[in-house]
Amino acid sequence: MFCVQCEQTIRTPAGNGCSYAQGMCGKTAETSDLQDLLIAALQGLSAWAVKAREYGIINHDVDSFAPRAFFSTLTNVNFDSPRIVGYAREAIALREALKAQCLAVDANARVDNPMADLQLVSDDLGELQRQAAEFTPNKDKAAIGENILGLRLLCLYGLKGAAAYMEHAHVLGQYDNDIYAQYHKIMAWLGTWPADMNALLECSMEIGQMNFKVMSILDAGETGKYGHPTPTQVNVKATAGKCILISGHDLKDLYNLLEQTEGTGVNVYTHGEMLPAHGYPELRKFKHLVGNYGSGWQNQQVEFARFPGPIVMTSNCIIDPTVGAYDDRIWTRSIVGWPGVRHLDGEDFSAVIAQAQQMAGFPYSEIPHLITVGFGRQTLLGAADTLIDLVSREKLRHIFLLGGCDGARGERHYFTDFATSVPDDCLILTLACGKYRFNKLEFGDIEGLPRLVDAGQCNDAYSAIILAVTLAEKLGCGVNDLPLSLVLSWFEQKAIVILLTLLSLGVKNIVTGPTAPGFLTPDLLAVLNEKFGLRSITTVEEDMKQLLSA
């Protein structure tokens, strides 16, 4: 096992990365190794998808499957070894079908890629794990060095984050052939074990630029189906009655669940990154979407144990449900998996609803505590002139984009302290689950404009980027000249690709934490600092002073 893709990875003087029987996320060495094997199979599939496009062949089954299967290897998504192998087998079957299509056009069609003809050696998981050793990401570290390995992983993990957003967009009916062609090209190239530093740096920026387009179609999919989010108050306390909790990012799953629970007497609560759903008109119209439950994903083993109903996980993040003894009432959807947990193959939630009706639910309603969400792209752009007016009248000094992933590390309290230290004449724009560090606190307003503005899920960084570009255009300056600072927390691969997106767009002087990615060497961090001004957090006092004086 070698996995260094998330923020909580093991860090030692000898090197970084989880390489024992189990990773810090709970992933076993078996599952981790089989995920490496799956990635190799997906690289071979992409190599043939690139070749097929040369013949004008676009296989939509391949295009829809490839990012979805890659998504299953993202942190805290799928811990089920047999399902990972199932994805690998499907990748090979699709590859062979695509290969046959190519050969039907050109009998001499071939692909020069070491993954292009990969076959699984056995049905036995142990044998497959031994085969996977050929594809462990650091297998040639001694030959290429830590810097090249780090750049490879930056590209691989960044592309994995983009693949997750591609799947979210695809579920909502969004498809862009150019994006899929670019994805396959990059995925196939990474399967050749590239070792050119400049080419890898260029690839990382290409991934960032591609992901901006992915976020654009995801935004179109969400707003096209569910309307543009508008500011909405959400209750974060319990309401009496039977209940279901839904977590993850998939708004379509939430919509289907709301439709199927309507009139059943079962209330629905959002959790984690599903919180922004309350801002969408076509979702909040369901009166039994009664509120948001819990806090950051890392607290789920305590909070889920206390929730008196079933739980549905639609995407990341799931962690071991046996710890809180709720594994008999947690359900996985789509690419999510945990051994022994019931999985919903389709969009029928009747079994979950039946379980909810058999459980006690909340016995009484607590005193409501309301927070505000729903500052989507249209709302943000509608406030652009107000922001400019406040800045011109020196009522608004600075805007801090304070968001990203949450996690268990104690140093993450920095983000709570930073939020509460932001001066009263400054505004906090937040997104993603890092907001749970401070989103239940009171921040007041500046002439009626809330000082805490919740823009949505991690992918809604797109809205923040569009706002920044709009403000810069209206003020006749560059984005980096705005009174705007980005202080981002990271945990997994979606955050990595958001960072690459920002860097590829030329955004500079981003501050990240709580620690630097374990796969980035001091040399690589120095390069990123020199090129983009990217740096790690220090103390709240020092960072606040530096950012306000910039």
UniProtKB/Swiss-Prot annotation:
Q: Which residues carry this modification: Cysteine persulfide?
A: 405
User: What is the top-level taxon of the source organism?
Assistant: Bacteria
Keyword hit for Cytoplasm: yes
Cite the binding residues for [2Fe-2S] cluster: 3, 6, 18, 25
Q: Which is one GO molecular function term here?
A: hydroxylamine reductase activity
Positions contributing to hybrid [4Fe-2O-2S] cluster binding: 249, 273, 317, 405, 433, 458, 492, 494
Entry annotated with the keyword Cytoplasm: yes
The note describing how and how many cofactors are bound reads: Binds 1 [2Fe-2S] cluster. Binds 1 hybrid [4Fe-2O-2S] cluster.
Q: Record's Gene Ontology CC terms?
A: cytoplasm
Task: List residues traversing the bilayer.
Answer: none
Gene Ontology biological process terms, A to Z: response to hydrogen peroxide
Q: Which cofactor does it need?
A: [2Fe-2S] cluster; hybrid [4Fe-2O-2S] cluster
From the Swiss-Prot or TrEMBL record, state where the protein is found: Cytoplasm
- Sorted alphabetically, which keywords does the UniProt record give? 2Fe-2S, Cytoplasm, Iron, Iron-sulfur, Metal-binding, Oxidoreductase
| Catalytic reactions on record | A + NH4(+) + H2O = hydroxylamine + AH2 + H(+)
Q: Which HAMAP family match?
A: Hydroxylam_reduct (MF_00069)
Function, as annotated: Catalyzes the reduction of hydroxylamine to form NH(3) and H(2)O.
UniProt-listed PANTHER family = HYDROXYLAMINE REDUCTASE
Record's protein name: Hydroxylamine reductase
Q: Which organism is it from?
A: Escherichia coli (strain 55989 / EAEC)
